[in-house]
């Protein structure tokens, strides 16, 4: 009724997996010695973008770990680099980003380069579980992450994506959390999220937690 009967695809482009958080379920966590760290150089970023354009992609989501190196200015610069790449008549017309929550000024910086959707997942809306699974790092602050989208709205970014990682807690509770998060944004800002995501935990290198998540979610669920 709103978007029509269509499916829109976007390709993921991981810019860097450096991270100072220690999320129990994540292969990128700082304590995971098996994770090989890398951040794309400008030339590498251009090459990746050209390869995606050659495959016909026009929409990307750029993904960043949470690390001082990935500042709002760095994110804005990498987004602009992608927009500038025109290869064999291809171009990226929309760059969405998945990055750590910022302050309002940080969000204004990334907005200035014309991002599409800003996406951030709460992971779990169950606060006690959240604290157990995020023992250290900036992401350990439940409320800072929860109200990240409020700050994005205040910065003028009204195209947002929310989500919960299924398997961390009871999926029915998480669905309720997603719905109430949507209601909160609609009531405060007059607009809800553009997208709602519900990925499931998948195995990650050096991460035993992912092999047997406490709240497995089936296809039927």
Which residue ranges define each predicted feature?
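Active-site beta-loop-alpha junctions enriched in small/polar residues
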Residues: 14, 65-67, 98-102, 123-125, ...
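Active-site loop-helix segments enriched in His/Asp/Glu that coordinate
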Residues: 37-50, 67-83, 107-108
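Short helix-terminating capping/connector loops at secondary-structure junctions
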Residues: 2-5, 88-93, 189-192
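N-terminal pre-triad scaffold of radical SAM enzymes
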Residues: 2-32, 37-63, 116
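Radical SAM/AdoMet-radical enzyme domain recognition
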Residues: 23, 59-60, 72-165
């Amino acid at each position: 009724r709103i978007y029509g009967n269509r499916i829109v695809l976007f390709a993921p482009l991981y810019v860097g997996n450096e991270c100072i958080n220690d999320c129990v379920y994540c292969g990128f966590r700082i304590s995971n010695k098996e994770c090989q760290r890398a951040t794309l150089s400008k030339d590498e970023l251009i090459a990746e973008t050209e390869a995606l354009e050659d495959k016909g992609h026009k929409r990307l989501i750029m993904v960043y770990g949470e690390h001082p190196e990935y500042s709002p200015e760095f994110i804005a610069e990498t987004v602009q680099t992608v927009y500038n790449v025109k290869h064999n008549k291809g171009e990226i017309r929309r760059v969405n980003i998945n990055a750590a929550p910022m302050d309002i000024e940080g969000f204004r910086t990334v907005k200035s380069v014309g991002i599409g959707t800003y996406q951030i997942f709460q992971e779990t809306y169950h606060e006690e579980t959240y604290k157990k699974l995020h023992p250290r790092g900036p992401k350990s602050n439940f409320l800072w992450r929860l109200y990240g989208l409020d700050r994005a709205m205040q910065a003028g970014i009204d195209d947002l994506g929310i989500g919960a990682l299924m398997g961390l807690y009871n999926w029915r509770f998480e669905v309720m959390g997603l719905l109430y998060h949507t209601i909160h944004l609609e009531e405060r800002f007059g607009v809800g999220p553009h997208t709602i995501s519900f990925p499931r935990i998948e195995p990650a290198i050096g991460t035993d937690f992912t092999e047997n998540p406490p709240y497995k979610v089936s296809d039927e669920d």
